[in-house]
């Protein structure tokens, strides 16, 4: 609260995480004096837009996996769980570590459940993506920074939100 007038929340987080993180930020801002209502809130939102829901999830699953590899677990997953990310389950972490140990990043990607991808990204059909981005807005995000999972999705994502 005493350093800036806004925040950019990181990628691969759910709207529920966003609510929790913004509560922590608001409490801190109120302690240190700035008016939280004047804060700008941006968030990087991983998106995958396809006509087929499963295809969309598979296209962005790698991004979720990068946050759950053995090196990143303590730096990324741990803090997210402490803030209240409901889609990362402590009991799954040994399974992810084992999948990575046995199959590298490809093994880990295959081990990431759909629930993780659906929970921490805005992915699916165009209607699903639009609805999910609205959930981030409802959680307090004023500036959604949409990041497509694949280059071929960029124009479609731009067109979807240009309407």
Feature annotation, model-predicted:
Residues 2-3, 139-140:
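Structural motif
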Residues 3-18:
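Ligand/cofactor pocket segment of small-molecule handling proteins
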Residues 6-8, 38-44, 142-145:
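Structural preference for beta-strand elements that scaffold enzyme active sites
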Residues 12, 44-48, 149:
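Active-site beta-loop-alpha junctions enriched in small/polar residues
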Residues 18, 23-135:
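An alpha-helical appendage that flanks or caps ligand/catalytic pockets
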Residues 18-28, 151-163:
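C-terminal helical cap(s) of enzyme catalytic domains, especially alpha/beta-barrels
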Residues 70, 119, 142-148:
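Bilobed periplasmic-binding protein-like "clamshell/Venus-flytrap" ligand-binding domains
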